């Protein structure tokens, strides 16, 4: 069996594992089956190992760390996202909406690599002189790990905002005006919501079904804190990655910063999360306002990583679309 065949097998296997798991995670959300939880975790672990083996295979074959092109770096990002999810799951940080979102995201990413990315962009090729540096591993790997961490943290903020929306909707339906004072809003109420009070406010079947969502609403504060912790971990990595890239650029091209589109968007990404941490730590923001800033970061990362790269402009581009 040659390397190309092995790579294709691992790639195809990983995609179908993620594809099946996406449906099973949604089934788990509906049927609340403990067996499905165990199966889904095992499936994510198997897919993680499969991608790890794919990266190791390319590393051995090429002779350099496999993050030199879009195919390799995106698989490294997928592996990072999967690894962070496994870590959270094993540490009892289990959130159904996060499970569904991550599995769907991983399926789309691997599907893009398997079905859409041109074959020539998957091939192992010799490094250009500028990439023959130890800074390649340092810069790109740290950036990818920071992206994975910040993506999960931002995704948790998006889920948190969805919970806030559900709380507002739920309170309107059960007419829980008596629980709110004139100076309260849904953002402060979400931390102080009384399950028993809401349960006693309505006896109808419709409201009883709605009140089942309170078990998820109770996770909201945990979501907010977990998002903050992940972003706090990912932000220094992003900073280190950008600095490493600047040092590498100076060695390769004689300039620390050239305002390449990738560099510009990396700075924008850094500023978004710097603003989030500043408002959270210095200004004391919590809840909705801080989560909105973090949620914006999720989309900014994708523009920085994929959007700019695929436009075919600048030294970081892969030159596919234009």
UniProtKB/Swiss-Prot annotation:
It is found in: Plastid, Cyanelle thylakoid membrane. Pfam families: Cytochrom_C_asm. The keyword Transmembrane helix applies. One of its GO terms (cellular component) is cyanelle thylakoid membrane. GO terms for biological process: cytochrome complex assembly. InterPro entries: Cyt_c_assembly, Cyt_c_biogenesis_CcsA, Cyt_c_biogenesis_CcsA/CcmC. May interact with Ccs1. Belongs to the CcmF/CycK/Ccl1/NrfE/CcsA family. This is Cytochrome c biogenesis protein CcsA. It comes from Cyanophora paradoxa. The gene is ccsA.
